[in-house]
Each structure stands twice: as C-alpha cells, then as structure tokens.
Amino acid sequence: MTTLEACREVDLQEPLAPLRDWFDLPAGVIYLDGNSLGPLPKATAAHVADVVQREWGQGLIRSWNDAGWIDLPQRLGDQFAPWIGARTGEVVFTDTTSVNLYKVLSAAIRLSQEEFADPAPRTKVISERSNFPTDLYIAESLCKQHNLELVLIEPEELPACLTPDVAVLLLSHVNYRTGHMHDMAQVTRDAHAQGILTVWDLCHAAGAVPVDLNGSNADYAVGCSYKYMNGGPGAPAFVWVNARHTDKFWQPLSGWFGHAEQFAFTSDYQPAAGIRRYMCGTQPMIALSALKCGLDVFTEAEKYGGMTALRRKSVALTDVFIELVEQRCAGYGLGLATPRDIFARGSQVCLTRDEGAGVDGVGSGAYAIMQALIARGVIGDFRKGDGGNGPHKDILRFGFTPLYTRFEDVWNAVEHLRQVLESEEWKKPEFNRINAVT
C-alpha cells in the first residue's frame, strides 16, 4: 500500500469508515494525536448544552435523582467495562489517573504487606524507567510513606527483577514513549508466581488495543478517558479492581461518595461495597456527561466488529506508516522506537532522531520537525529524551485511532514529513521556539 491511490481504495472498502462521521474533525487537519487528546464527537456539544441548560438549569438539584446523576460514574463504567475485559460493577469513572493510581497502589501495597509478606517482608515496588512520569511520582511518594524502595528498570530487565522481595509491579500496558505493549497475561502470571501484585496503567491502551483484565487475572488498573475514548480535556479517569480484592480494604481517600450510605450523613466512614468505594468526593457531572458521548462511539463500534475490527485496522495503519516512513523519509536521521512486532505494538508509532542532528548541531531537531508538521495541519506530538545523557532519545509521536484515521491520512502525513525534512523548513526560528505544551 505504497501509493495514495492504493490507500484511498482501502479506505473505500474499510468496514469502520462510517465511524469517522461521528466526529467533528476540522477541515484540512490530519489528526494523529488521539493518543494525547481525542477529537470532539459530534454529539458532545449538544449533549453537554442539554445537561447545562435543562438538567442543571431547569432540573436544578432534582437532577441528581431525575437525570440519574448519582449513579452516572458506575453506569459509564458498566458501558465501557467489556472493552477492557471487566464485568458489570467492576469499573467506575472518577477523579484523575494520578488520584486513582494513588488509591489502587496504596491498596496494593497494604494488601502485599498484610497477606503476601511471609516468610520475608516485601520491600520493593518495580516500574519501568520510561513509565509515564505521573506514575513514577505517585509511586515515589507512596514508597516514601511505606518505607519501600522504588526500583526503576528497562523493559528487558523485567523477568530478572520479579523476585520474592517485590511487593507490587506497576506497569503501563502500552508505553507512552515507545508504543511498546506488554503481554499483560504473561507478565501477570510471572509476577503472581513470585507473590507480586500487579497494577496496570491503561492510559495508552484502553480503547486502542485489546485489554482483558479478568482474563489476565490482573489485580488493579487505572486509565484516562480523554485519549482514545474521546471524553474531552481532563475527562474523568477510571479505576478497576479485581473482585477478589475490592472489599478487603478502604482506599485511602475515603470521601463521602465512597460511603455505603452517603446520605445517612453519619460521622464515621463505612465503605460502600464493590467498586463504588473507590470514589471520593462529589463527581463532575458535566465532564462525565461529555464522556458519555465518547463512550457511545464505542457502543456504535460494536456493530462493526468491536475491538477485533479496531485492532485489525490499527495494526494496518501503523504498518503502512512505518513502511512509508522507511521508504520515503530514508536518509534524514529518523529511527523507529516502536516495535515492529504487532503483538508488542500499541496504536502509535514513535520515531527518534539523534542528539546533535538539530540546528547547528544542537539537540535533535525532533521538536522543530513536529512543529513544522503541525503548521501544515499534521498534528502529532513531541516527547523529550535524555538529551544524550541516557538511553531515551527525543521522540516524534504519531497516534493512529481506527475510529477516524484513514489510510489516506497516513500517506499524506508521511508526504508532509518528507517535505519538511527535504526542504529543511523545520530549521526556521519559529519552529524551534519551545511552547509550554509539547
């Protein structure tokens, strides 16, 4: 599929093509950043306006009952649960990924200390050095609180690090920097064989790749909804806990929405049964209502083959992108950080550029290349590396969302990349000024 005409022909035959019409995509834009922020579903603006004007404006406080606000976090969790291998009643949308990770990692550490510390105490939490920073910050904070050691490793070191002194393994199912995807079931089996609990971050996986939490026998999982789920900026995250663990402990943020009888207004805390205990304070109804429109697209996608169809197209999109970049952009210092193995690849492709390849030999030029692409209407993003002081290079990230990305978009994006590199327009000063958000 190396010509524009061939890509267009495949688009005409693509079973998932009707789902693109569910999104309000700007004209002239090739959007390859759904792994950072999903686009606006067409239904969202009107639905949120109705929530604001009718449910809030006219219904006022009655809408907690009449509009079903009170149980919306659980209903949305039930709606999305099958897409991550969860059962009804096991998922709730609430708070942020960072806050939810604090809850479940706290619970996992406590569970490990109380039930898995025999014959010797478990003193370590393991994570990848390239894990998303907020995960590492939360883990660092909790390790300090519990007098544990946070051990950061490279992916290839993982098997040797699963030892009986480890309490919890904290991993992202799909790595944000490379797109590498772990075999969740195998990693979980290996961890459990050593008595280690698993906490999975699904931010770059949920809605993009097959996830089977119960089938993998995972322990805890969190994830955001503003990427592949298209819930909007800052949309509520989700939390899942394996049913065998849910009712064992309070999570540490014991707010009134997690109380067994919140409107009894008792002075002592009694946690709700099940996943509802992982909620904390009053829930953001407008944001949750916007998220519902994003999840409705997934409900519609079930008519077209569900995750099996999405994954098939995702693999094809990323395959074509890699093939075209290597054919059409050779000789410009780009490397591939993302696995070629489709069973180890998420729904993104990450390209590297060597330190010293930038203007006047400073930096990699990757940031400026991405800015030049964005100026042309090809939107991806940039993630900074170690600046030559470590193993991680600067990254140009491109996300491929089967709900709306076309093969024609892939071809055109690579052609723009080729032109940016060949013309060296990325060297212009305006593309080398660093913005607050990269």
Where is each model-derived feature located?
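Pyridoxal 5′-phosphate
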Residues: M1-T438
